[in-house]
Amino acid sequence: MTSPMTSPVSGPVVREPASAMTRFSAMEALAAQLSDELVVLSLGGAVDEWYTAAPHLREASLFQQQLGCVTPQALGLAAGLPHRRVVSLDTDGGLLFNLGVLATLGNERPGNLLVVVWDNERYQSIGGPRTHTSSGTVDLAAIARGAGVVHASTVRDVGSFAAACAAGLADTAAPHVVVAKVDTSPEGHAAAGHPVVRRKHSDGREDTYRFVRHVEATEGVMIMGPSEHN
């Protein structure tokens, strides 16, 4: 995750949150449940991990680069394609940057949207300063429920995570928010025996075109027409 515009919680860098699951293992469990869904995900380490864990969803994944925009953009896709399942892979820092989107989810209740929040309790990409969720007081799932998202839960192991995602993908009546407490440290990744994470060899512009062309092909619509200058 990248730094927010305001300073993160002060204090020394802390250990990873107590969790029996790495983010990569959770990604593998989720990827196994997805086929033709559209995925919007955050910037930072999650990008390369998803690129490695879900190669079959490469064209269907939009790698977002603005903090606080992942779930709002996924919500827009869900509204525009109500017959299509959309998955938001957000982060604790990203969601904290735009908590207002939870109120919109609570009011609009898009039944085709699953929101996963990777909560490692830190801004990892700038060295690991803590986010507000590390205090033990700030509960993103509780905030979501308070905003009207009835199906919002926090999970700490792969089995519970997979079950919560399966429930969200099967429910067509309301959105689900799954806050996954994860270990994103290199040590945890190595200890779990995960493969080496491959770097994504494309930039944001190429990713956008790939994603749009995928939506066009699978939906039979034109979103970005031919350029008049070609």
Where are these regions (language model features)?
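A detector for short, charged/polar N-terminal pre-domain segments
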Residues: 12-17
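Acidic-glycine-rich active-site phosphate/pyrophosphate-binding loop
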Residues: 37-57
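SAM-dependent methyltransferases
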Residues: 1-4, 193-230
